[in-house]
Amino acid sequence: MSGVVDRVREVWGDETEEEDYAAFPWVHESEPSLVGIETSGRQELWGTVEEVLEVCNHVEGTVPVLNMGHIHARGHGRLRTSEDYAELFDQARETYGGSTFYCHFAGVEHRMGNALHYTQIKKSDLKFEPFAEYLAEEGDWMDITIISDSPLLEHDAMYMLQHYDKARQRLLEIRARDERRAKLAAQQGIDPEELKIKEEEAAAAR
């Protein structure tokens, strides 16, 4: 790991050194762009989540590029629920510390921990809905860009946007319902959870 970090530093440079950015002399005349370090999709290649986050934590000017298809494949289908995404980004927050992320998303066919090729999202066991749910509920702290890698590029880009919008709408509806319930419970002098139970019992009796 230290060898990879040192090599990235060697190429990209260190702004505290006199001869910084030797490979990119134009940097002296403008603000340097971020360099994305992407997770790889095969077991024998460098580029696990841990390795990528470690480099981005140590090398200024780099940003993690989390390829969800690759992560899902290397983890033998690890991204299945919103909690799986929460665990991934909690790990990123603890190790990397930043809030800027680029994410690639597409369906993926995988075998023995290796990504074989991208597919349409609907034809893969990697579903976007849990990711959309996580982003809607807990993603406000991130500056995130999601890039469609699907063979149906524009179609699946719109598919992802629609599911994210639906997840946001569901969250707003839940919050509005909880606020209404809390207000009614306060008026009746009871606990909101008690009112929720009464509402569920009334709905079941209908």
Which residues make up each language-model segment?
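Intrinsic disorder/low-complexity signal
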Residues: 183-206
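Amphipathic, non-transmembrane alpha-helical secondary structure
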Residues: 2, 6, 18-21, 25, ...
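Conserved, mostly hydrophobic/aromatic
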Residues: 67, 146
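Gly/Pro-rich active-site loop or hairpin
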Residues: 46, 72-143
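Active-site acidic/histidine proton-transfer and metal-coordination neighborhood
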Residues: 1-66
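Short, well-ordered coil/turn segments that N-cap beta-strands
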Residues: 30-35, 60-62, 97-101, 140-144
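C-terminal helical cap(s) of enzyme catalytic domains, especially alpha/beta-barrels
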Residues: 154-171
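Active-site-proximal loop/turn and secondary-structure-junction residues that shape catalytic pockets
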Residues: 39-43, 68-72, 107-109, 152-154
